[in-house]
């Protein structure tokens, strides 16, 4: 074993995590370690079954003493034979790095920051917030959970985030990976997990699955149309199309949504539905409502349609309702849609009375879920839901749409 490098690695690690490395002001207590404490080096040094380890370590210590990089305190009466403590000499720290073949931590940090620099002006706030925290942590000599040795990995992350912010439409994961990296699996195997960790920590919306997190930034497992059913006229490339002519509704692909113009909504109201089963049951029995399936949090193509619908409603007001799960996620989805698209959005069958009627079919939740509901209860942004949240906390159950559909039919 290269004991010289091992000794210096331990000492330099202690130095890099010290106040001295951060402030430049030398502490009276130099970076050091003791062979009396339990660690890998002391285990080898004090191995009575293999005395050669001590001889090799002593040889390494004496060479480093000769080069003035370290100072050694020997056991009493055992000078040059049994070491007790090893100290790093401040004046010879640069030589210690060179001798060990180790790149200084500060240089690694600076290189990572240079790689991450484009994220300082990224259009997504959670990305900018993460970059800012990394920058501040580095200034305080903390790594902020950054792998300083994985420069390539962060280069790939920056490349992915830079391309994602410019996406107008959603894109299948493997198509995106091939387009950006020339490898259909690289995003999923190398970048996805790191991106999700950052997004979950700094994003302002808490999704229920990795799939939903990725969909919210435009990454899909597969392309999905937007399902819509109602008596609405649209125009695409100059041609008028009456969607009311399709009794089972219609699936709009991204390119169609991009080019369509909403001409007229003949229905008396609009209902956004979170769950597919509920959507299908509702379109069977209602003929004067425009239904749109959101599939949980609206994906990019759903968002594009909702934006166009919102523009139409500015001059042709029609009531808009959202029908979602009676749980933490359902509340979040409602508030997101209200905040982003329809300020007058109203909930449908998401009240205390509906909850009480179907709570016996609900799913129990644990302490972590309860804590999230309690935070909502403390936030006035969710005041519309406080009575429902109190009821959920009392019953310790959440009610999904499928339960309501199944027990009403």
Curated annotation (Swiss-Prot):
Cellular component GO terms held in the UniProt record: chromosome
UniProt xrefs under InterPro entries: JetD_C (IPR024534), Spo11/TopoVI_A_sf (IPR036078)
Gene Ontology molecular function: DNA binding
Loss of function: phenotype: When this gene is missing the Wadjet system does not confer plasmid-transformation resistance in B.subtilis.
Function (record text): Component of antiplasmid transformation system Wadjet type I, composed of JetA, JetB, JetC and JetD. Expression of Wadjet type I in B.subtilis (strain BEST7003) reduces the transformation efficiency of plasmid pHCMC05.
Protein name (Swiss-Prot/TrEMBL): Wadjet protein JetD
Species, as recorded: Bacillus cereus (strain Q1)
């Amino acid at each position: 074993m290269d004991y010289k490098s091992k000794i210096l690695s331990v000492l330099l690690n202690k130095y890099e995590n010290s106040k001295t490395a951060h402030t430049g002001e030398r502490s009276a207590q130099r970076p050091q370690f003791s062979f009396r404490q339990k660690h890998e080096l002391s285990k080898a040094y004090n191995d009575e079954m293999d005395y050669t380890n001590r001889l090799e370590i002593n040889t390494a210590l004496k060479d480093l003493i000769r080069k003035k990089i370290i100072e050694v305190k020997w056991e009493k009466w055992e000078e040059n034979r049994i070491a007790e403590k090893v100290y790093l000499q401040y004046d010879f720290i640069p030589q210690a790095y060179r001798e060990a073949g180790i790149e200084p931590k500060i240089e690694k940090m600076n290189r990572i920051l240079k790689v991450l620099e484009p994220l300082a002006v990224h259009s997504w706030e959670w990305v900018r917030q993460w970059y800012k925290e990394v920058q501040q942590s580095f200034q305080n000599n903390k790594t902020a959970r950054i792998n300083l040795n994985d420069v390539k990995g962060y280069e790939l992350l920056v490349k992915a985030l830079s391309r994602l912010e410019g996406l107008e439409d959603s894109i299948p994961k493997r198509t995106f990976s091939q387009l950006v990296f020339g490898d259909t699996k690289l995003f999923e195997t190398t970048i996805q997990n790191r991106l999700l960790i950052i997004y979950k920590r700094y994003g302002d919306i808490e999704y229920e699955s990795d799939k939903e997190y990725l969909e919210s930034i435009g990454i899909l497992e597969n392309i999905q149309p937007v399902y819509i059913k109602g008596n609405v006229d649209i125009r695409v490339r100059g041609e008028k199309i009456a969607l009311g002519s399709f009794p089972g509704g219609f699936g709009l692909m991204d390119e169609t949504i991009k080019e369509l113009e909403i001409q007229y909504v003949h229905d008396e109201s609009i209902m956004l539905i979170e769950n597919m089963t509920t959507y299908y049951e509702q379109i069977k029995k209602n003929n004067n409502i425009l239904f749109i399936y959101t599939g949980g949090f609206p994906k990019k193509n759903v968002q594009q349609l909702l934006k166009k619908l919102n523009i139409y409603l500015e001059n042709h007001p029609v009531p808009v309702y959202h029908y979602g799960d009676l749980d933490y996620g359902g509340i979040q989805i409602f508030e997101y849609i209200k905040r982003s698209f329809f300020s007058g959005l109203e909930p449908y069958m998401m009240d205390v009375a509906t909850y009480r009627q179907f709570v016996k079919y609900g799913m129990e939740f644990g302490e972590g879920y309860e804590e999230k509901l309690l935070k909502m209860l403390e936030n006035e942004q969710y005041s519309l839901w406080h009575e429902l949240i109190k009821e959920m906390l009392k019953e310790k159950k959440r009610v999904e749409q499928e339960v309501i559909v199944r027990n009403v039919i």
